[in-house]
């Protein structure tokens, strides 16, 4: 009988031990999960504040007035469009490398080119040079339809996946040479080019709707933002801002050599 009693006592102790262990594990798990959620929420709040500071101090104060552009820049999480190692620098007003000898444009230039294109909720936009996908995301926050061409297949795939994951459904990306635009989807109310040829491609002007604007950096070492507006009688062209973009490759480079 004593032996049976001892066995029962041992079993009860083991059962209590298992119950206590399960309780401690569940409590620790909840605490860890809660800590991770809290850390994630704090990081999200931090990124929102960084975007607000970027817009107010680097963009609005430099003369960007279009509230749709400012709201789009506050909304798009730029840190997701740069390498993880550079995420803490994402909201500096600087271009950053994204691999493949390409860069993401500085926030002010993105805002400037977007505002210059004069977008509305009904605008259909073509972007030449998807790159990281950041400019395309800003455009998609404002315009009704965005089409973007990237000459590097790896970047096109990476950007498409990221933008899909972020929920952009009014944006279409394809891999190809953007020098001749996207004639199947023309005309466009605005065309933004994020790589610099040494001349304005004629095909892009032809794909503008009347009243539409082409915003493009033009030049080799010395580049300027060039704005071409299509009118009933032809086009008007102005140069506005000195910039430094990566050169446009593909057919643009071949034609540069031929000139």
For each feature predicted by the language model, list its residue ranges:
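Intrinsic low-complexity/disordered segments
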Residues: 2-3, 30, 132
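Bacterial N-terminal signal peptides
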Residues: 16-33
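Generic short N-terminal amphipathic or hydrophobic helices
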Residues: 6, 17-19, 36, 150
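Short amphipathic alpha-helical segments with coiled-coil-like heptad repeat character
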Residues: 2, 81-83, 212-213
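Conserved nucleotide-cofactor-binding alpha/beta core module
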Residues: 118-234
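N-terminal secretory signal peptides that target proteins for export/translocation
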Residues: 1-12
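Positively charged
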Residues: 254-259
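Class I SAM-dependent transferase core
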Residues: 34-126, 137, 142, 157, ...
């Amino acid at each position: 009988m004593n032996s049976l009693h001892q066995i029962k006592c041992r079993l009860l102790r083991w059962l209590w031990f298992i119950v206590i262990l399960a309780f401690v594990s569940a409590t620790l798990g909840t605490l860890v999960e809660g800590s991770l959620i809290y850390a994630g929420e704090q990081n999200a709040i931090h990124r929102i504040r960084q975007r607000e500071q970027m817009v107010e101090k680097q963009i609005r104060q430099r003369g960007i007035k279009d509230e749709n552009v400012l709201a789009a820049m506050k909304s798009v999480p730029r840190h997701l469009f740069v390498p993880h190692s550079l995420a803490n620098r994402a909201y500096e007003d600087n271009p950053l490398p994204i691999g493949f000898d390409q860069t993401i444009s500085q926030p002010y230039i993105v805002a400037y080119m977007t505002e210059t294109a004069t977008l509305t909720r009904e605008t259909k936009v073509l972007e030449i040079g998807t790159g990281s996908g950041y400019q395309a995301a800003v455009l998609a926050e404002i315009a009704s339809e965005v089409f973007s061409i990237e000459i590097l297949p790896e970047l096109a795939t990476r950007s498409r996946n990221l933008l899909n994951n972020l929920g952009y459904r009014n944006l279409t990306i394809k891999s190809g040479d953007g020098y001749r635009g996207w004639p199947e989807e023309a005309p466009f109310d605005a065309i933004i080019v994020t790589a610099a040829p040494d001349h304005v491609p004629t095909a892009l002007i032809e794909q503008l709707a009347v009243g539409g604007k082409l915003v493009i950096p033009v030049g080799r070492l010395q580049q300027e933002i060039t704005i071409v507006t299509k009118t009933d009688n032809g086009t008007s062209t102005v140069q506005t801002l000195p910039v430094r973009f990566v050169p446009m490759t593909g057919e643009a480079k071949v034609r540069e050599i031929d000139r």
